[in-house]
């Protein structure tokens, strides 16, 4: 998608998309969890991703600068593999707001990738995140009855189950646009760049 500077500001973030196989497993996990947690707002499977860096609202002309800034990372960063497993919540079980499934595996390489992205974008005016990066896929958002949801999660044993969904291959980075509608956030891929490949993709 070619962007023009006349467009209004865009709400964007960098993330890793899920494979079709992993997305199907997420759908099945959400289906199973719905039986115990009918009161939460489930994220649409096509919207689930691994966020690397949230940029917020930027002028459309800034998008190409962002892609140029991460070009050295794209050409030198080796792909890595994560294991998607283990349920958890933010901020805590007493009143959870987010239900997620976590990532294990090559976390040190992932943290290094995120750190490199932070460093590349800071000169453009994007400050590093204050909170430590915690890799996860958001499965559901809890807006009402969150203390009840916390009780269900505590007594059901769901958080103790491994819930291993398989591998997430981090071999490309996608710049997404986020638009909020009455149906929730809708994400549009603006550009996807493969890792460790020579040549311009901007």
Task: Report the location of each language-model feature.
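Histidine-dependent nucleotide/RNA phosphoesterase domain, centered on the 2H-phosphoesterase fold
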Residues: 1-202
